[in-house]
Design a protein with these regions (language model features):
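Extracytosolic ligand-binding ectodomains
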Residues: 1-162
Length: 162
């Protein structure tokens, strides 16, 4: 059936942690996410190389997310010279962090505390004998509001099923 209708799913559907067990059934599946172990940037190549050397497998979305989150925390704490005694200062420091070079690409935060980062459209392919999420399109610097102005978006009614 997937040769007639493309299979599209959430980013974690084909996460690198499950791809090996999915086999060829995963080929061609399309998914969006802010990370792929196949991203072609120097930071990701180094991250994948070191991760594979240490753990014997490629990193997943979960691994990269934890790694990048700790880099964000480290930069925020460093900017506070280690003084983490006041929650409001920690939050402010975190919201002001910008990382231009991470395995996933650049990341920063909007004034609401949500990330602004690239979203990658990925397609599962077999490359070098392994399944991977090949990036086929990049939406740069996506915020929670997509391409809408936050002020206008927030005026809209909340979604309900009723």
């Amino acid at each position: 059936m997937k040769d007639k209708i493309p299979v599209i799913g959430t980013g974690t559907l084909t996460d690198e942690s499950v791809l090996p067990s999915m086999g060829d059934e995963a080929l061609g599946v399309i998914s969006p996410l802010h990370y792929s172990a196949a991203l072609d940037n120097p930071q990701n190549k180094e991250f994948v190389k070191k991760y594979r050397a240490k753990y014997g497998k490629i990193p997943s979305y979960y691994s990269e997310t934890c790694y990048t989150a700790m880099r964000l925390v480290h930069q925020a704490v460093t900017s506070l010279k280690g003084d983490v005694s006041k929650a409001d200062r920690i939050l402010s420091a975190l919201q002001s962090v910008t990382l231009k070079e991470t395995p996933r690409g650049p990341i920063k935060f909007d004034s609401y505390g949500n990330p602004i980062q690239n979203i990658y459209i990925r397609k599962v392919e077999r490359v070098g004998g392994e399944l991977q999420n090949t990036v086929i399109y990049t939406f740069p610097e996506v915020s929670q509001f997509w391409k809408y102005k936050p002020e206008e978006y927030l005026k809209r009614p909340l979604y309900t099923r009723g």
